[in-house]
A protein has these predicted regions:
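Redox-cofactor binding/interface segments in oxidoreductases and associated redox assembly factors
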Residues: 24, 143, 164, 198
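Hydrophobic/aromatic beta-strand patches that form the interior of the parallel beta-sheet core
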Residues: 50, 77-79, 161-163, 197
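Inter-motif core of Ras-like GTPase G domains
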Residues: 155-166
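ATP-dependent carboxylate-amine ligase catalytic core
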Residues: 25-27, 31-46, 71-157, 173-177, ...
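Short functional linear segments
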Residues: 1-54, 61-63, 67-72, 79
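Short active-site-proximal "capping" loops at secondary-structure junctions
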Residues: 56-58, 83-84
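Internal gly/pro-rich beta-alpha loop/helix module
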Residues: 160-161, 174-198
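Short glycine-/small-residue-rich Rossmann-like dinucleotide-binding loops
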Residues: 146-147, 166-168
Length: 198
């Protein structure tokens, strides 16, 4: 794998290959690095921010919420992971999958902002998609948590409404070996005084 930064003519596959090589670990939970880079980018999201966590059913819940909001006439951004076939599936604006060009533009911005801060693939791509949404003047954003909640990159967003679909034993190496420990991690997507759905 190439570790050199993609040049201005690089396509999305070249960027994705590069992103797999810039951090020593595939999963490195924590928000310090992500917040530091986010502070160098304009990630101000307009509209209502929904965050969805849980062991199972996150993607389905996000898709249903997106569908309801679109049917009501709102401009909606949807971020889910992982993707099934193409990376672009992770970011949708008004039901349309983000283009390669739109994603590459955001990757270039995150790369310029991060300096020497090492980010995981998920952290880097999360920041890029949040920046895409911030520039899209959306009425609502639906964000799926990647792993857990408390230390997941998506949790840098101050959600207006947080949803936890279910809690079960999963990713026990990172989240704990009991439902209580896993629930503690996931509950950190809730915000004081704001709607919490479970």
């Amino acid at each position: 794998m190439s570790t050199s930064r993609p040049d201005a003519s690089a396509d999305l596959p070249a960027w994705l290959q590069y992103l797999e090589s810039i951090h020593a670990k595939a999963i490195d939970l924590g928000l310090d690095r992500v917040r530091q880079v986010a502070g160098r980018l304009d990630l101000s999201l307009d509209g209502v921010k929904f965050m969805v966590g849980g062991t199972n059913g996150k993607g389905s819940t996000c898709a249903m919420l997106e569908s309801i909001l679109l049917a009501a006439g709102y401009r909606v951004g949807l971020y889910t992971s992982p993707h099934l076939i193409d990376f672009n599936e992770r970011a949708r604006i008004n039901g349309e999958i983000a283009s390669d060009a739109a994603l590459v533009q955001q990757f270039e911005a995150v790369e310029a902002a991060r300096g020497d801060i090492s980010l995981t693939y998920f952290e880097f791509t999360t920041l890029a998609i949040l920046r895409l949404f911030a520039q899209s003047r959306l009425d609502a954003v639906v964000l799926e948590v990647g792993l857990g909640g408390r230390l997941d990159a998506v949790n840098i967003v101050d959600a207006d409404c947080s949803i936890i679909t279910s809690i079960d034993l999963d990713h026990t190496d990172w989240l704990g070996d009991t439902r209580e420990k896993i629930g503690f991690e996931k509950a950190h997507i809730y915000r004081a005084g704001r709607p919490a759905i479970c």
